[in-house]
Amino acid sequence: HLANLKAIDPMKIFHKTIDYKIYNGNHQIPVRIFLPGEKMEDDLPVFLFFHGGGWVTESIDNYERICARLASATDHIVVSVEYRLAPEYPFPIGFYDCYMAAKAMYTNQFILNTDPDKITLIGDSAGGNLAAAVSLMARDQGEFLPKRQILIYPAVNNDYSEESPYLSVRRYGTEYLLTCLLYTSDAADDT
């Protein structure tokens, strides 16, 4: 179904959205729920979506059309997470927002009563990194265990050296949008 996203006319997509908040301590994490039809059904599978943007740009608003298409094309509910961005919120703040959103979904502390076996973590670029990292932390913490991920061109290799196997990194490895150094824990320690 994911391969058919471009075939769907975005102007003909019917979708209903619901804005909701998940709590992470004193912070409210905004999420937007995209329904593939007119009403919310608890038995539908869910994509928990983390947007890309190098951990410093993008939002659930900018990903509205993508998430609506995803819901419509796959008959899944899509829950898009508005995690906090660097540099205003250095690592690991945005990551913990994503983790807490996933924990709320998997432990039924959310508006949807979704079967945990029907939840898939999904993200592109930095969002793919977050989906993978949330899965690893969930495994390590033992609080819940995601069974599926869809990682779309995930940012998973942090080698920005001149010896990198990737030409783009060797040429542009110090450019701001490629490295987003303010999101790394090393940069956060320097502030």
Report each predicted region and the residues it spans.
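Primarily recognizes the serine-hydrolase "nucleophile elbow" in alpha/beta-hydrolase
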Residues: 103-111, 117-164
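A glycine/proline-hinged amphipathic helix-loop "lid/cap" segment
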Residues: 1-36
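Short substrate-entry loop that stabilizes the transition state in hydrolases
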Residues: 40, 53-74, 79
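Single conserved hydrophobic/aromatic residue that forms the stacking wall/gate
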Residues: 183, 187-191
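A catalytic-pocket lid/entrance helix-loop region that shapes and gates access to the active site
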Residues: 161-181
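Short beta-strand element of the alpha/beta-hydrolase
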Residues: 43-51
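Alpha/beta-hydrolase active-site loop signature
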Residues: 54, 83-87, 156
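Catalytic nucleophile-loop/oxyanion-hole region of alpha/beta-hydrolase
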Residues: 59-60, 66, 79-118
